[in-house]
Swiss-Prot record:
Gene designation: mia40
Name of this protein: Mitochondrial intermembrane space import and assembly protein 40
Composition-biased stretches (Polar residues): 70-86, 104-114, 227-238
One Pfam family linked to the record: CHCH
Lineage: Eukaryota, Fungi, Dikarya, Ascomycota, Pezizomycotina
Transmembrane segments: 45-62
Source organism (scientific name): Aspergillus fumigatus (strain ATCC MYA-4609 / CBS 101355 / FGSC A1100 / Af293) (Neosartorya fumigata)
Locus of motif Cx9C motif 1: 163-173
Length: 297
């Protein structure tokens, strides 16, 4: 019933029977596994390529994570590189700022005096002819180009009004006149301009008032003055020479208007003086009357 152990050991085979061993590579599938089709291979390659593309282009992986050991290790290095300012490095900067403030306080007092000295010296060096040329350049007429700026504010916009053509003719005639005294050949054009002004009193009321005042002053001066043996030679002042070069543009525009009004009054006075020379003086009538009474007696 019980078999001895020695008998069992003798009956058991010493070496187990082994089948033939087949060799294969890691990449090759085992013989018991089914071979995959080419479609599954393409799908796997596509998924791998998509994962790589998403990893390279997505912003999720581009952001630095909030919890990172690399960021904690880099912060001590950056803090060591930055150096805090010391007292020795601040002292030179404080000295430079104080010196700059002291220079800024002293310079404004010296600059106005230098500017005033330069302006005074420039005004003293300029001759009356240079002052006249400068005034002409800033006024309506430019002697260098020989052109008239009809849009100049000093003309008061009269060149573009209803009498603009008459004003342009009279003003250009006076500017380009070569007669002595200047403007004697432009009397008729100035009279035509004044007649045009009288046709539009609403527009040229101020100019008409100036002309009336100039005519009244000329009439009173002609009535009071006695005729002399030699006719007085008319002189035309050069008002543009009186313009100060240091005045601003507004002052020069106002002076240009005064010059224009003065020229008109002088032309009117010359015309009335030429007419008064042909008239018989009042003293001659008185002497003739006394002579006639004496002859009758």
């Amino acid at each position: 019933m019980f078999r001895p152990a020695t008998r069992i050991l003798l009956r058991a085979p010493g070496v187990a029977a082994r089948g033939p061993v087949s060799r294969r590579l890691i990449s090759t599938a085992p013989p018991d596994a089914k071979s995959r089709s080419w479609k599954s291979t393409i799908v796997r390659l596509g998924l791998a390529a998509g994962a790589v593309y998403y990893y390279n282009t997505s912003s999720v992986f581009a952001e630095q994570p909030s919890l990172s050991f690399l960021s904690k290790q880099s912060t001590p290095d950056s803090s060591d590189e930055t150096q805090l300012p010391t007292i020795d490095s601040i002292k030179p900067r404080i000295r430079e700022e104080r010196q700059a403030e002291s220079k800024a306080v002293s310079q404004p007092d010296a600059q106005p005096t230098q500017h005033e000295a330069l302006s005074a010296s420039e005004a003293a060096l300029k001759s009356p002819q240079e002052l006249e040329d400068e005034a002409g350049q800033e006024a309506a007429f430019n002697p260098e180009t020989g052109e008239i700026n009809w849009d100049c504010p000093c003309l008061g916009g009269m060149a573009h009004g209803p009498c603009g053509e008459e004003f342009k003719a009279a003003f250009s005639c006076f500017v380009y006149s070569t007669e002595e005294p200047k403007g004697m050949d432009c009397i008729d054009k100035f009279k035509g301009m004044q007649e045009c002004f009288r046709r539009y009193p609403d527009v040229y009321g101020a100019e008409l008032e100036d002309d009336d005042e100039a005519d009244a002053a000329a009439a009173t001066a002609a009535g009071v003055s006695e005729p002399s043996e030699q006719p007085a030679s008319p002189t035309v002042s050069a008002p543009t020479a009186e313009i100060d070069a240091s005045s601003d543009s507004e002052g020069k525009e106002g002076r240009a208007k005064d010059v224009h009004a003065q020229v008109k009054s002088e032309v009117a006075e010359k015309a009335e003086q030429a007419e008064s020379d042909d008239l018989v003086p009042k003293a001659w009538h008185d002497t003739e009357g006394t002579k006639a009474q004496q002859t009758e007696k």
